[in-house]
């Protein structure tokens, strides 16, 4: 039997999961996406010098840039067929073989044009201060249709008459909402049908029973890597609701969103920045000013190049929040942590760690459940000395500055999860390994 590892973001997304998934695929034969859609963005930097290439992926699992690794899109993913085919074409144009190594579950709900129209119209209608910060890509409305049992799924594409009947029914409902409630234009039935059917034959060879394929791979002794998107604090159930995404981003979804049994998941790796970031609206207790020069927040934003891969919006930045990570660790059952972007903190004289909050006159050591309570939290900080030496590209634990090691050990103590990996740069080999998830 192989060993299977789940990689999860523990904050509000953008933790650096793509690089770690790519690095781990050196020991995996398969990589699986199990939730989200093309609202997720992973940036991979592969190669050295003039041969270096940057890949920006949204739907295709990060393992695709590793030769011979099979990639799977599980039933928990919502699929924009046009975007997927465009992404595949982009990869193939630079010599990455995709189609022979990619499987798509027939159960993936399809993102169609009316989902995008609904997403954008709803966000535009929200008053300032209540905007979610959606990417406007139709993710939320597609998940709504899935739960309401009216979604069109990938396998529906291969039955044109049935697809047209279902489309007419669901479009009648959504056009009523668009025109009567949101005061925007209706979506044309024929245009939607033609757009969907255009992609059917291109997708057909890629569609397989992913659940069965993963079971067979596991039985054959393959190591499998489950690639989470977004982060735990954006989870629709466990995040800062309603400022969340529309899917479950936690480790438990790896099973539900791919069709493998929970007992087949052996190790959960939580990816965590050495500080915190957030894109879009919602409470952020340890948030700092990122606009004022020569401040810690500005350094995090500028040195960390904190711009959203998908949205191109500036990410909000703040001190590491151990109380938030403590909740993430429990929800996900984390086996180990991977700390990323440690070098962004190089040169700061002091570092602060949020260890808990004051809420209604009481001290709490765990991120509250509701966004309203989180917004009222006053962070409690512990101060630690910084370091002046560089940590960028360091490959051995003992070569890190003493204060950097002390900072990492303190994070470990506060969160109750061992730091197994430290990422010190975007390259594959800029990684310190204390314990390998695959036992290598």
Curated annotation (Swiss-Prot):
InterPro entries in UniProt: Adenylosuccin_syn_GTP-bd (IPR018220), Adenylosuccin_syn_Lys_AS (IPR033128), Adenylosuccinate_synth_dom1 (IPR042109), Adenylosuccinate_synth_dom2 (IPR042110), Adenylosuccinate_synth_dom3 (IPR042111), Adenylosuccinate_synthetase (IPR001114), P-loop_NTPase (IPR027417)
Pathway: Purine metabolism; AMP biosynthesis via de novo pathway; AMP from IMP: step 1/2
Cofactor(s) required for function per UniProt: Mg(2+)
E.C. no: 6.3.4.4
SMART domains for this protein: Adenylsucc_synt
Protein's GO biological process: 'de novo' AMP biosynthetic process; IMP metabolic process
Superkingdom of origin organism: Eukaryota
Keywords, sorted A to Z: Chloroplast, GTP-binding, Ligase, Magnesium, Metal-binding, Nucleotide-binding, Plastid, Purine biosynthesis
Record-listed substrate binding positions: 309-315
Residues where GTP binds: 13-19, 41-43, 315, 341-343
Residues spanning the membrane: none
UniProt cross-references to CDD domains, sorted A to Z: AdSS
Binding site for Mg(2+): 14, 41
Top EC category: ligase
Compartment(s) of residence: Plastid, Chloroplast
Binding site for IMP: 14-17, 39-42, 135, 149, 230, 245, 313
Summary of the function given for this chain in its UniProt record: Plays an important role in the de novo pathway and in the salvage pathway of purine nucleotide biosynthesis. Catalyzes the first committed step in the biosynthesis of AMP from IMP.
The protein's name in its UniProt record: Adenylosuccinate synthetase 1, chloroplastic
Lineage, broadest ranks: Eukaryota, Viridiplantae, Streptophyta, Embryophyta, Tracheophyta
